[in-house]
């Protein structure tokens, strides 16, 4: 009998000294597991270091947000001086059936190691820390985007939940034009506001864009629509995204178009700067 009481006492004593972090870890996993959030910095590294204010002492190269920004949390592990968040990358690609950007799971995983300057004691404290690393608000999400993307997303982002776990896009005007076969192209002859005839720029040096690994793995095909300026020398500038394709192909299209050369537009025989839109097609030939 005394032996049984002694063993029971040991069990109770051991239970008293179990670290409180274990129960908090369970709470955090229940709260965040399988939820998807947008990183403020779309770093490409599979393992990333952060402090509790979201600063990264070992910041890696940045990549397209449609490949590297969205992360679905799979596991949270608490340690005495840090939190480890394991996740799966979630891409954004154009869905031709809906005519919008939509989520698609990628094979790549990512691990976030967050150092703590004080013990983690509550779920609210952890949420505050995550808010420095992920864009929980629509404003923070838009601010995290490259300028190239911002006006496009701002115009067609339908909804962004309070914590950023869900986002929805509207069908853009550019998408409707592509569907209807009426997308803007440089016309053979244009008329300026003062009635003078303007000849459109003509392609002189055009190269094809490259596919991203993520886009290839998803068999993504389609058309990126860009707005740009062709200056008096035939060079492109002020490239802006009008209709995206996702999975890094938009950045690939823009980088390629930067190298294009045109015979410049002319007005009364003189070279002039002109704004136009171009379509960049992505097709996989097997």
Specify the residue positions occupied by each region the protein language model found:
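Bacterial N-terminal signal peptides
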Residues: 5-16
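Extracytoplasmic
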Residues: 32-34, 43-45, 68-73, 78-82, ...
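N-terminal secretory signal peptides
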Residues: 21-79, 160-163
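A beta-hairpin/wing motif
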Residues: 173-177, 181, 218-234, 268-286
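A short, well-structured alpha-helical segment
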Residues: 219-220, 235-266
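Acidic, low-complexity proline/glycine/alanine-rich linker and hinge segments
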Residues: 170-217, 255-257, 286
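Mature extracytoplasmic/lumenal regions of exported proteins
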Residues: 80-181
């Amino acid at each position: 009998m005394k032996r049984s009481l002694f063993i029971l006492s040991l069990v109770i004593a051991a239970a008293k000294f179990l670290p409180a972090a274990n129960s908090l870890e369970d709470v955090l996993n229940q709260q965040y597991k399988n939820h998807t959030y947008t990183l403020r910095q779309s770093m490409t590294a599979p393992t990333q270091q952060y402090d509790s204010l979201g600063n990264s002492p070992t910041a890696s190269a940045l990549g397209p947000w449609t490949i590297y920004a969205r992360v679905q949390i799979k596991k949270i592990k608490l340690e005495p001086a840090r939190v480890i968040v394991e996740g799966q990358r979630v891409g954004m690609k154009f869905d031709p059936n809906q005519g919008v950007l939509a989520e698609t799971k990628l094979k790549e995983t990512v691990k976030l190691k967050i150092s703590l300057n004080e013990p983690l004691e509550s779920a609210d404290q952890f949420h505050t820390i995550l808010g420095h690393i992920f864009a929980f608000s629509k404003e923070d999400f838009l601010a995290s985007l490259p300028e190239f993307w911002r006006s496009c997303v701002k115009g067609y982002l339908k909804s962004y939940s309070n914590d950023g776990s869900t986002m929805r896009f509207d069908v853009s005007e550019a998408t409707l034009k592509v569907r209807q076969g009426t997308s803007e192209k440089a016309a053979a002859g244009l008329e300026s506001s003062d009635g003078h005839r303007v000849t459109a720029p003509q392609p002189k040096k055009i190269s094809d864009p490259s596919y991203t690994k993520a886009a290839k793995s998803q068999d993504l095909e389609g058309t990126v629509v860009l707005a740009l300026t062709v200056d008096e020398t035939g060079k492109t500038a002020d490239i802006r995204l009008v209709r995206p394709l996702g999975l890094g192909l938009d950045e690939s299209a823009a980088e390629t178009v930067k190298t294009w050369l045109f015979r410049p537009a002319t007005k009364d025989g003189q070279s002039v700067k002109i704004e136009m839109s171009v379509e960049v097609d992505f097709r996989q030939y097997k």
